[in-house]
């Protein structure tokens, strides 16, 4: 992880290697903490695959420094940056415009500098949808259970709303679940809430999506998949460990399982395509990401 000064020195060297200062596009991710981020791995692998004059760094930015960081990135000539916790909502006042996806999600994970204006976008939900579509069709026939009603669940539910899939929200705090249902309905989607862990709805589900951060240890996860039909798709947005206890239970019950690595991949791919207005080298980015996680 570079400091800004180290980045400036690196930028000059990189620019010269491509024929002159000013030819390189610069991107980054900001958050706190940020050392664990794998975004630079996949983005830089993509630039290398296409021989693009671009680079991607990660910068730790504390909440109190967010405003200065936004101004600094713009002043330093960055073409765009990703935003991760805890800044996805607090960055909104520093932006000039929001895309429909950002408005719908109420949060931003991608910023593009366009003729001096800062455009906020959200690729979390669309990244999840793109990864999900590799495993199932999305339309009004699908019954999808979403476990949780936090930020991740909101982004996913709002991205699924336009497909008219039947969403069932299950949350341990019913009030938050009801709030998410209302948001989906407000945007024209189909959703209702069921009691946390209600097996009857699990038996009907085509897909179950686990969006909470709990449950890395089986004894900590207050939910059972008992009653789910074999062959259903079960997704956990966590990707480390590769198979959470939740996914292990689903596999034992005969379900198809998917972790969150492709959600991470496709939110990055969608950010790339938003910034560069061109197709990203998905397989090169996927390979780099998988190698970074599995060695």
Where are each of the predicted segments found?
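Phosphate/diphosphate ligand-binding glycine-rich loop within oxidoreductases
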Residues: 6-8, 13-137, 241-243
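Phosphate-coordination loops involved in phosphoryl transfer and adenosine-cofactor binding
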Residues: 24, 140-143, 230-231
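Glycine-rich adenosine-cofactor-binding loop
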Residues: 31, 120-122, 132, 136, ...
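Conserved beta-strand positions in the Rossmann-like core of class I SAM-dependent methyltransferases
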Residues: 57, 168, 258
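NAD(P)-binding Rossmann-fold cofactor-contacting core
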Residues: 163-185
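Rossmann-like adenosine-cofactor binding region
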Residues: 187-257
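Rossmann-fold NAD(P)-binding glycine/threonine-rich loop
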Residues: 232-282, 286-288
